[in-house]
Regions:
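Sec-dependent N-terminal signal peptides
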Residues: 1-5
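Subset of outer-membrane beta-barrel
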Residues: 6-279
Length: 279
């Protein structure tokens, strides 16, 4: 029998972008928000709960869905995130070529995590715990992960951040045990404010246990009044990608769109994000 690779999406769905801002600028541990990659930098606007809903598509027509919620309480920011990535209409075929597949099936991954962040003098700490579930055809696996984060204001709008993600284990499939894509991201950012304009430059590097080489991210977020213009660039050994996006802040609501162009020619990732400031 010829089968789709056993892991399908695999646990790598855990490192896919969660919202339009991350897709547009990159995975930076100094970028705060409802869906920050750094558990230390989850934020809630004006001490109100925040809700984020994202929907998009990744390479190879993989669908992306993400829900984020943050709640300030007693000097801490508590957060909950749910993430789904799926690939449908995979074909099951014999070794003998046929016009029609014997059947179709899907591959998917689900992650739910919650935790909190707290602030000290010029620094923040964060932690979150994840429940992970993935499946392909009749195969299923589940497990738990731990995410840690730290951020520090250095001076004059410059920030340092580091996060370690996906420390944990998964249950065994029929033959093998999936491994989590443990990764560490470190980076710096610099914010420049001039009159009504605010520009933030990001630079980060990533080490991923499942990758043979590191990955570098460079991004920029320019804000003027209610408008945001974003751009980014990422590079690893064999893959180079550029990205862009824009956002519109309508007070209690914000809409953000991001798109990425890469050298793999496997599709054009896009994500649309809606954020709400709750009462």
């Amino acid at each position: 029998m010829l089968l789709f690779p056993l892991y399908g999406l695999g646990t790598q769905f855990l490192v896919l972008p969660t919202d339009a801002e991350e897709l547009s600028i990159g995975s930076h541990p100094t970028m705060s928000g409802i869906s920050s990659v750094n558990p230390a930098l989850f934020s809630a606007s004006l001490n109100h709960p925040g809700l984020s809903i994202s929907r998009g598509i990744w390479l190879g027509d993989v669908t992306l869905t993400h829900l984020g919620y943050t709640q300030p309480a007693k000097g801490k920011i508590f957060h909950f995130n749910a993430k789904y990535s799926g690939l449908s209409d995979l074909e099951f075929r014999d070794a003998v070529p046929l016009d029609d597949a014997l059947s179709t099936f899907s591959s998917y991954g689900v992650s739910m995590n919650s935790g909190f962040s707290m602030q000290g003098e010029k620094q923040k700490f964060g932690i979150s715990f994840s429940y992970i579930f993935m499946g392909l055809y009749t195969e299923k696996s589940s497990g738990f992960g731990l995410n840690l984060g730290y951020a520090r204001d250095i001076f004059k709008g410059m920030k340092l951040g580091i996060t370690i993600q996906n420390l944990g284990i998964m249950s065994k499939l029929s033959k093998d045990t999936p491994s989590l894509p443990t990764r560490m991201i470190g980076g710096v950012s610099k914010q420049i404010i001039f009159n009504d304009y605010r520009n933030t430059i990001y630079c980060s590097g990533e080490w991923n246990q499942s990758a043979s080489t590191g990955k570098f991210y460079f991004g920029n977020n320019f804000r003027w009044d209610r408008l945001s213009l974003m751009g980014g660039f990422s590079a690893s050994e064999n893959v180079v990608a550029s990205s862009a996006g824009f956002g519109l802040n309508l007070g209690q609501y914000e809409i953000t769109y991001g798109i990425q162009f890469g050298s793999q020619n496997l599709g054009t990732p896009q994500i649309l994000t809606f954020q709400f400031q709750l009462p």
